[in-house]
Amino acid sequence: MESSRWDKDPPGERRPQQSQHWRARDHGARGCGPRQPTATASPRPGLWITPAHGSHTPQTNTRRTQADNIFIYESWLIHHGTQMSSVLPQPPLVRGPWHNTNSPWDSWASRGKLRVCPCRTPRLHSSGCFSSKAGTALSPSLPVPGLRPQPPFLQKPLSILAPATPPALVSPTPPKLSPGQLSPHSVNVHWGPQGHLHLPRSGTTVLHAYLQTLSSPASHQ
């Protein structure tokens, strides 16, 4: 009876430790020797049933899990450099790295390559709001290749960028600084590419003194 590829051991060969195990039948051409049965798709998708032994080998206690099937499938891909599309109808279910796609570019084709998340574009100043060196930071007026042009409402003179106070409280005259101090316009204050205000690293006290003079009660008269 040729309906099933898998059947129980014939009762003549049954041994007590092997009684419940399924054995693979060889339906080869007549006159061929025993051959290794090919992979069979189980009714549960994502599982591939392959005999874990050659047809000469008696079957020992073997369980094959989903991880084993993925490993077998991926080792085939590494060895042959192609998808087993003619042998396996679909690859076993493997999650893509970010989205739930099962495209062949997700898990195995990009194993060694650096994967960039498709949701993010690489940006300048990715380290946060502070540039690494305050002097080399980009001012919005300079055209930088690869950087989006700034919207016009961000291109303002630096004197109105620095104070965080509402405009009614800012005095129209610039604050008087002692001659030892720099003018507030020489401070490296600039807008980052996402519209964050970049301040110089801590240790610079000029901007702090400038903001203090702005918020002092003398400047509100």
UniProtKB/Swiss-Prot annotation:
Residues 1-64 are annotated as: Disordered. Residues 1-16 have a biased composition (Basic and acidic residues). This is Putative uncharacterized protein DIP2C-AS1. It comes from Homo sapiens. The gene is DIP2C-AS1.
